[in-house]
UniProtKB/Swiss-Prot annotation:
Propeptide feature ranges: 23-41
Organism name: Anemonia viridis (Snakelocks anemone)
One GO molecular-function entry: toxin activity
GO CC, alphabetical: extracellular region; nematocyst
Organism phylogeny: Eukaryota, Metazoa, Cnidaria, Anthozoa, Hexacorallia
Signal peptide start and end residues: 1-22
Keyword tags: Cleavage on pair of basic residues, Disulfide bond, Nematocyst, Secreted, Signal, Toxin
Principal location: secreted
Cysteine pairings via disulfide bonds: C44-C84, C53-C77, C62-C81
Domain called ShKT: residue spans: 44-84
Record flagged with keyword Secreted: yes
Entry protein name: U-actitoxin-Avd8e
Length: 84
């Protein structure tokens, strides 16, 4: 029963896609409305804030260029390092 429901939904979706692609004005209107929506910028967060960023990694580690800890800090603790 679930597969029949899925098949019906896919067929309805295909018919709607054919209708939209046949009417270029409608397609352009839909695309323009989608492009106008403001996408929120990705928030700057520290991935390992609860256990690593701030306790193991210090802001001084962000400036170390050749250490593994510095590379980890620059990649995963951007808020702590002030890169945001």
């Amino acid at each position: 029963m679930a597969s029949a429901r899925t098949l019906v939904l896919l067929l309805i979706g295909a018919v709607l896609m054919c209708q939209v692609s046949a009417d270029s004005e409608l397609l352009n209107e839909i695309l323009a409305a989608h492009m106008e929506e403001d996408m929120p910028e990705k928030r700057c967060i520290d991935r390992y804030r609860s256990n690593i960023c701030g306790s193991v990694i210090r802001p001084l580690d962000c400036t170390r260029r050749k250490s593994r800890m510095g590379r980890f800090a620059r990649t995963n603790c951007k808020k702590l390092c002030g890169f945001c």
